[in-house]
A protein has these predicted regions:
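Short, low-complexity, charge-dense intrinsically disordered segments
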Residues: 242-252
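Conserved, mostly hydrophobic/aromatic
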Residues: 7, 31, 61, 84, ...
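Structural motif
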Residues: 26, 52, 79, 144, ...
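Generic structural signal for hydrophobic
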Residues: 23-24, 49, 76, 98, ...
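Glycine-rich phosphate-binding active-site loops on the catalytic face of alpha/beta enzymes
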Residues: 83-91, 189-221
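C-terminal helical cap(s) of enzyme catalytic domains, especially alpha/beta-barrels
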Residues: 95-99, 212-236, 254
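Conserved anion-binding
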Residues: 2, 64-148, 152-157, 162-170, ...
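Short, acidic/polar
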Residues: 12-23, 67-74, 130-138, 189-197
Length: 257
């Protein structure tokens, strides 16, 4: 069974990102490139990771008019991204445009509510609590054609019951048991859980970055997270993450590791 771990490559240094990816090896089923890396290295970051045999989640959280988001999706697919995030708050027309532009080249993952958002943050922008907003946004995204949802591990059990086994549920805000680290200025994740708890609740994939990339041994830390997740049981709905289609030109560099 493929690892459910998505390794977050939170750096502006492409060589560092590649080094982390290679150190994690097969312990990470995918890697995530976000604004920090792509802002510094551009689409070449995705192309380099995909060319290294990696399945790439491009975490741009697109939220714009439908035509602009569609153009962004086409560019992401050309670069080699397999999953691309958009904000479900963009609404049905934007989500449908993203799905249509992605076609069969990549998948659209709709972000519900950021894991950094607490009740006060949501109230400040006029949104209901996450327990109410997340199921509504997830249902909207699925109706619009999205087959992957990004949500906090605290909401994944309710979404798994609501959406069934076919929808891929991807959980950031995952912290290994006992990890006490935080970024400068404090912890920026408000709704978190352990890898085991996220998997038991029904997650398909878990996104983990700093607890692995800040460790002294990236490979060992990645394997520990993967093992903790898989020991809790199979990914949500009992489906192997590898069953989701890979890009046609993936090189499979890590299959032999």
């Amino acid at each position: 069974m493929e690892s459910p771990l998505v390794l977050a490559l939170d750096t502006d240094d492409l060589e560092q990102a590649l080094a982390w990816s290679r150190a994690a090896g097969k312990a990470a089923g995918m890697v995530k490139a976000g604004l920090e890396l792509v802002g510094a290295a551009g689409p070449a970051a995705v192309a380099a990771l995909a060319g290294d045999g990696r399945r790439v989640m491009l975490d741009l959280k697109l939220h714009d008019i439908p035509a602009t988001v569609a153009g962004g999706m086409r560019a992401a697919a050309r670069a080699g991204a397999e999953l691309v995030t958009v904000h479900a708050l963009g609404g049905p027309a934007m989500l449908e445009a993203a799905v249509q532009a992605a076609g069969d080249r990549c998948r659209v993952a709709a972000v519900t509510i950021l894991t950094s958002a607490g009740p006060e943050d949501l109230a400040a922008v006029g949104l209901p609590p996450a327990a109410e907003a997340v199921p509504r946004l997830a249902a909207l995204a699925v109706r619009s054609g999205c087959r992957a949802i990004v949500c906090s591990p605290l909401e994944v059990a309710a979404l798994r019951a609501q959406l069934g086994p076919e929808v891929e549920l991807i959980c950031p805000g995952v912290r290994p048991a006992g990890w006490g680290g935080s970024p400068p200025g404090g912890n920026d994740q408000a709704r978190v859980a352990t890898p085991a708890a996220a998997m038991v609740a029904g997650a398909t994939r878990i996104v983990v970055g700093r607890p692995i990339t800040r460790s002294d041994d990236v490979g060992a830390a990645a394997r520990a997270v993967r093992d903790e997740a898989l020991a809790a049981g199979p990914p949500g709905g009992g489906e192997d993450p590898a069953n989701h289609p890979k890009p046609a030109d993936a090189h499979g560099r890590f299959d032999a590791l």
